[in-house]
């Protein structure tokens, strides 16, 4: 967003939108990686978080780690899936993702990722608001 504001260069617009789409469900698992967003969609429901697991507190807007290479996942210690793998059909030899409290590698909320997501959402809102506030050239009133 800042890069585009300063340089007026739009070469990364498509990449930005693709990342946004991927985080919110246009990915091999068809699920958002953001707890509770979008509303009424497939989002993480059983994150590796004591707040939700023990206290039943929602962490709306929290970005989970997301997929990890299968080769890494298979060598991690201490991962136990507590529920049947609802994404088993979509798992591959390349990458896996589990919406399961027991998988800290793919389903743990991440502070740095959530902070970056907050920036992305704020930038999108600012971009939308500025377009809405300034009338288009040649538009009739």
What is each stretch, according to the model?
Residues 1-138:
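Aromatic (Trp/Tyr) and acidic
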